[in-house]
Amino acid sequence: MQETRKIALIIGGSRGIGRGVALRLARAGFDLWLTYKGNHTAAEAVRAEVETLGGACELIPFDVSSYAEVEAALAERMENTSPDVLVYNSGITRDNLLMWMSREEWDAVLSTNLDGFFNVTRQVVFAMLKAKRGRIVVISSTSGQVGQAGQVNYSASKAGLIGAAKALAREVGKKGIVVNVVAPGFIETDMTAALPKAQVLPLVPLNRLGTVEDVASVVHFLCTEPNMYIHGQVIGINGGLVM
């Protein structure tokens, strides 16, 4: 009898860290439900890579900030199937000093990064509780641990994710669901491409930017290690930037 492949739901999986996590889990034998908002070309490219690795990848487009869109996309899928893993990786920036920040810049970041977590995870937790198993990994940021000038909105959203994940871990741990947070620092992605390395690297004791694979390897461990005893924790991947 062929063993049923596990399913990983990757929220925000078409580029950057999400793409790296998707490919790492596909190599580990997971089939994927991969969500994205607008970049269909990038999402299709990830699906093609996953299929090359021998896995299946279902693309699910929606805006995480819309509860109605999330519910319409996920509720029916999860009536009879629970994903084994949820990786919440949705995140945007609208950087500005608070004194100049518009309400739109604040709302856009909080609704995508933090409200989106509620919109998605509420759907998934019901299914995981019914299945009495699951792994949830939330991608936060060092900005949510120490704050960054010019990122009051982003830092608030990422700190909120840490608090939400810790509270959720207390709610569902006894039901067989393991919840953890990964907090990357400066990782080489589109989001950090404009950073001046000459100014950034002196802040990092390991003297390099992180790679997507640095993050993906930790997420893979949290999603696959049997008898996991790491629960409700924030794992920094930052080269020593935050200790």
What are these regions (language model features)?
Residues 14-16:
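Conserved glycine-rich cofactor-binding loop
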Residues 30-45:
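Conserved glycine-rich Rossmann-like NAD(P)H-binding loop of the short-chain dehydrogenase/reductase
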Residues 97-98, 105-110, 136, 200:
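Substrate-binding pocket helix/loop in short-chain dehydrogenase/reductase
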Residues 121, 157, 165:
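Active-site helix of classical SDR
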Residues 133, 211-237, 242:
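C-terminal substrate-recognition "lid" of short-chain dehydrogenase/reductases
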Residues 141:
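Residue(s) in the substrate-gating loop at a strand-loop-helix junction
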Residues 173, 178, 230-232:
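Short, small/polar-rich loop/turn modules that mediate ligand/substrate recognition or access, typified
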